[in-house]
Design a protein with these regions (language model features):
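Active-site gating/metal-coordination segments in enzymes
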Residues: 1-38
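Active-site glycine- and acidic-residue-rich loops that bind
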Residues: 1-7, 34-40, 66-69, 93-100
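Proline-rich intrinsically disordered, low-complexity coils
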Residues: 4-7, 11, 34, 43, ...
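Short amphipathic alpha-helices and their capping/turn segments at secondary-structure boundaries
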Residues: 8-17, 44-48, 103-110
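Helix C-cap/helix->beta junction micro-motif
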Residues: 18-19, 52, 82-83
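Aromatic-anchored, glycine/proline-accented short structural segments
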Residues: 27-76
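H/E-rich (His + Asp/Glu) clusters that bind or coordinate divalent metals
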Residues: 55, 62-180
Length: 180
């Protein structure tokens, strides 16, 4: 419920930029936690942080969490294209209300280069049947490990090696940590 455009955040952004620390910020809708203010859901509210030199990871790529909510995936896509250090993660995208974003992410290579893996465990991944078909969807439900299921779905959707390795680059992890 913090508005990222609030001027009181500026010293925090300056500190993050100075120490080259990324900011993971929730974007889009949220129904798994109570009392979320929908007025602070747009990725556009992170413009001041980007302007100050902060690397941003927009959780959920600005997607809605329920029908009827405002969806910001197009705002995310524009910001990802416009700002070198603006990324989004795919956490919880394997939910029926968020999986529509796969079209934007997978079909626009410029945007896809700004997407990193996220799982949002323990949110249960539900395969997007409209993209994978009913047989593949049923097959994925046989996987009892939700983290593995999330990964297998994204692999089947066509997420490439760069996607799986991008978080290590964005988070500036040392090679031995990233490959562990």
């Amino acid at each position: 419920n913090i508005n990222p455009a609030d001027p009181r955040c500026i010293p925090f952004y300056e500190c993050l930029a100075h120490h080259k620390l990324p900011l993971l910020s929730h974007t889009g809708g949220e129904k798994s936690l109570p009392n979320i203010n929908p007025d602070v859901a747009s990725p556009a509210l992170l413009n001041e942080a980007v302007r100050r030199g902060v690397t941003i990871i927009a959780a959920h790529c600005g997607t809605r969490s329920a029908m009827g909510e405002t969806d910001y995936v197009d705002v995310f896509a524009k910001m990802a294209k416009d700002h070198e250090h603006f990324y989004g993660d795919t956490s919880a995208l394997n939910l029926p209300t968020r999986s529509h974003a796969y079209k934007t992410l997978l079909e626009d290579q410029e945007v896809m280069k700004k997407v990193i893996h996220g799982s949002d465990w323990p949110i249960i991944p539900i395969p997007p049947a409209f993209r994978l078909g009913l047989n593949a969807t049923a097959e994925f439900f046989q996987q009892p490990n939700w983290l593995k299921r999330d990964i297998q779905i994204k692999q089947r959707l066509g997420f490439d090696d760069d996607y799986w390795n991008r978080a290590a680059k964005v988070l500036r992890l040392k090679e031995e940590v990233a490959s562990a």
